[in-house]
Amino acid sequence: MRGLQPAHRHLPDYRIILVAFRGRPASGTGHVAAELGAHRGDHTQDVVGAAARSLPGVKRRRGVRRGDAEFQRRFDVSRTVAREVAKSLETAKVVTVRRRIGLVSQPVEEWDALSTQVIHWKLHSTHRKEQLRALTELRLAIEPAAAISAARYAPIDVKSRLPLLAAEFRHTGENGRLDEFHKLDIEFHSLILRNSGNEMLASLSTIIATVLSGRVELHMYPQKPKPEALDAHDAVAQAIWQSSPNNARQAMHRIVDEVAETLQLS
């Protein structure tokens, strides 16, 4: 397999971000060690994440060719791992496979936007702010709707659990137990989505969990939770418990609006 080659030689401004996979970090991509450390998971997924975040697709260009052997050399992994990396990148639409050419990188806008892997990679790249904006807009679209549906259709045991969860959420936040606080936040939002009575909304719970955990990893939560955020979680829980769809929608909207304000996206 030959080294990396631009498929569009006529583009003078085209730059290969990962130079021949020989370990020289390009501007804006960071060192490989930092890239590997950014993704939590087994070694194969570490390599997948590092490879994806350093592809020329991040620069919105298409066309760098590479193969398994290059992944082996670049990341010092076995052929089996290299093939798994290539397959994962193809599944996420980060690359396409072309006969007699190999793997060809794709522009970032063609990646699988709803893949939790892709979301994670973008959050740890130079696309962080636009990814956070897109995800916050997604949350504004789906979470108030999920709160409405949960108020109508969630089982009684789930409805009764939410006020207790919100109280625990407040207690851990006010007492600085942030690790527990963040876990409860993920549980709270996931529980509402999964019990909305809408399988489409339920399927997005893993995406919202990825968003919330990503904010923790990136240190984008305030060290002291805002009282209005705690109040809004209480209000959502009470509205769903009382089967009040409109109040649930309004309170959930306040939660996501507060997130946008905190992240300076609004």
Give the role of each language-model region.
Residues 6:
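Cationic, low-complexity basic patches in intrinsically disordered or flexible, solvent-exposed regions
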Residues 45, 129, 140, 160-163, ...:
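Amphipathic alpha-helical repeat elements characteristic of tetratricopeptide repeat
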